[in-house]
From Swiss-Prot:
A Pfam match: DXPR_C
Cofactor annotation: Mg(2+); Mn(2+)
Gene3D superfamilies: 1.10.1740.10, NAD(P)-binding Rossmann-like Domain (3.40.50.720)
The protein's name in its UniProt record: 1-deoxy-D-xylulose 5-phosphate reductoisomerase
Gene label: dxr
Keyword set, alphabetical order: Isoprene biosynthesis, Manganese, Metal-binding, NADP, Oxidoreductase
Pathway of action: Isoprenoid biosynthesis; isopentenyl diphosphate biosynthesis via DXP pathway; isopentenyl diphosphate from 1-deoxy-D-xylulose 5-phosphate: step 1/6
Family matches, as SUPFAM superfamilies: 1-deoxy-D-xylulose-5-phosphate reductoisomerase, C-terminal domain (SSF69055), Glyceraldehyde-3-phosphate dehydrogenase-like, C-terminal domain (SSF55347), NAD(P)-binding Rossmann-fold domains (SSF51735)
Role played: Catalyzes the NADPH-dependent rearrangement and reduction of 1-deoxy-D-xylulose-5-phosphate (DXP) to 2-C-methyl-D-erythritol 4-phosphate (MEP).
């Protein structure tokens, strides 16, 4: 199978390259931003014919300009979008518009433009396969089920080691404290988003757009052994468990969840202690934003959330605010912003620019 990887030098991108090698698929091309050393490693390992460097065209290979040219020339069967941040939205849009099945790791695509991308997906008769432990687990659980059998979806959160800790302790957390997630190997930003539960807010919104079910509950399962669950109308519950290895999600998306291919170790249940803990939305009010976004599709709400989160996480990294202020500032800006309707997906970049400008203006005093 011919595969194009967008964002190939990031954490998910590198794991995708590893899975492609193990499955003996063909990497026809990739894009990246500025990690030239990692890009050279991929070129030496798999020698794809087409490379697009977003930061400097002199590193391109057989491509002059943009993603459209990269897709047209490389002619992939599927596209993996592992681009980080809202820049990945355009990549998802182009992939679906080109009638390519999309293997999606970019969260912002669905959080900001889920309704719009779903419309394009239907029009082009393509499929979006998630690359994420929770959504991949749900996809696997739901693939042979009918919607009228489903009562509720459950996604789990680890709590990143800080769930229900004393406020005094949370206030003292530093950027370096949060970099080492207890269960997963992740980048810096997603490690922080895991600790604040913002990542779980994103995942609730993503789950709705992927499965068209609004009744979604988050629960804490500290070991990250159980990734998701489905509660059926007969009140039975099916849980999904795998090792804490994102390559399972990548392998599953590439094989369309056939459950026959194996590139990760089996789960040793005897070494795990599994316990579910309820999340109090009054103690963690950030979750209320997720359900507000679900009630108001085709609006700027998802964009506002991702933009303000990106901004305050950077403030935290620069030690301008403490850990607890991250979600305080997010909630304050989100609930006071005059949200707008998104009529056209091509408006999104302009709307994001305006949102980011409003955020920078409001919180400039914190960045001095």
């Amino acid at each position: 199978m011919k595969i194009l990887v967008l964002g190939a030098t990031g954490s998910i991108g590198k794991q995708a390259i590893d899975v492609i090698c193990q499955l003996k698929y063909q990497l026809v091309g990739f894009s990246y931003y500025q990690n030239h050393n990692e890009a050279n490693n991929i070129l030496k390992q798999l020698n794809p014919n087409y490379v697009l460097c977003h930061s400097d065209p002199k590193y391109n290979k057989n491509v002059k300009s943009d993603l459209i040219e990269l897709i047209d020339k490389s002619k992939p069967k599927v596209i993996i979008n592992a681009i980080n941040g809202y820049h990945g939205i355009e990549a998802s849009l182009i992939a679906l518009s080109k009638k390519k099945d999309l293997l999606l790791a970019n969260k912002e695509s669905l959080v900001i433009a889920g309704s719009q991308l779903e419309a394009i997906r239907k029009d082009t008769k393509t499929t979006i396969y998630p690359i994420d432990s929770e959504h991949s687990a749900l996809y696997d659980l739901l693939k042979d089920k009918k919607k009228n059998q489903i009562k509720q979806l459950m996604i789990t959160a680890s709590g990143a080691g800080y769930f229900n800790k004393d406020i005094s302790e949370l206030r003292k957390l530093t950027y370096n404290d949060l970099l080492n997630h207890p269960n997963w190997k992740m980048g810096a930003e997603i490690s922080i988003n895991s600790a604040t539960f913002v990542n779980k807010v994103y995942e609730i919104v993503e789950a709705y757009h992927l499965f068209k079910i609004k009744d979604i509950i988050p629960v804490v399962e500290r070991s990250s052994t159980i990734h998701a669950g489905v509660i059926y109308q007969d009140n039975s519950i099916h849980f999904h468990a795998t090792t804490n290895d994102m390559r399972w999600a990548i392998q599953s998306a590439l094989t369309k969840f056939d459950n026959r291919t194996n590139v990760v170790q089996s789960l040793d249940l005897y070494q795990k202690t599994i316990q579910f803990e309820k999340i109090d939305f009054e103690q963690y009010p950030i979750f209320k934003i997720a359900y507000d976004i679900l009630k108001n599709p085709y609006t700027t709400r998802g964009a506002v959330l991702t933009c303000i989160n990106e901004h305050v996480v950077k403030l935290f990294q620069k030690q301008k605010i403490n850990f607890l202020q991250i979600t305080e500032l997010i909630s304050n800006f989100y609930w006071n912003y005059q949200h707008k309707k998104i009529d056209n997906i091509w408006q999104i970049n302009d709307l994001i620019f305006k949102i980011k400008a409003a955020i920078s203006s409001k919180y400039a005093y914190l960045d001095k």
